[in-house]
């Protein structure tokens, strides 16, 4: 039997999603908790591998098991063994052909940013921070140059293992909520560090360091050295994958209502 689970987590204490020999990853903690609940080893496949310090609101994983339990038993039972900064939000039985990563038709990220003369304290680790004022108009103008199918080589990390740098960036939404900004990105898939590299560039435009057209020039050049430095991971949230509606899998969790 194949199950799909939705997870929320704070990534600050972990070295990303993917399992590592030292065990200090979200996947390691999740699989340890699942194994304790199921009383046998459990392996998971995720929709999107988040980096160190990056959070998730609706990370989706699938697993195969012979254990027959009610879906919510998997939620409550696994959460019993998880640390406070990781929680299973939902569980659904799925067809054996379902694949958390390969079945996704898109993915969404949000970056939560504080604009303030003083660094965050209560929100430390949960938001990015800038102290120089931002202007939404040039940032939105710059973002428009990125929409569509492009070679995003200028925004991938040197460690990126993606077979192709060509991705379809469908939407960038920039919203201000008081002292906070929310940048939302939707694409077919993302390259390693792509959102954080885009954030660095958009902020350079928003602070008047660069003109909006500069981002189009960086994109066309395909040279990472032409772009801004990679921005901090603190405010980056994997909102989750998007699947065909007939799968009837949740695309929201309660944590979505926490974001401004």
Swiss-Prot record:
GO terms for molecular function: RNA binding; tRNA pseudouridine(38-40) synthase activity. It catalyses: uridine(38/39/40) in tRNA = pseudouridine(38/39/40) in tRNA. Coiled coil: none annotated. The active site is at 51 (nucleophile). Its EC number is 5.4.99.12. Pfam families: PseudoU_synth_1. Keywords: Isomerase, tRNA processing. Homodimer. Belongs to the tRNA pseudouridine synthase TruA family. This is tRNA pseudouridine synthase A. It comes from Methylibium petroleiphilum (strain ATCC BAA-1232 / LMG 22953 / PM1).
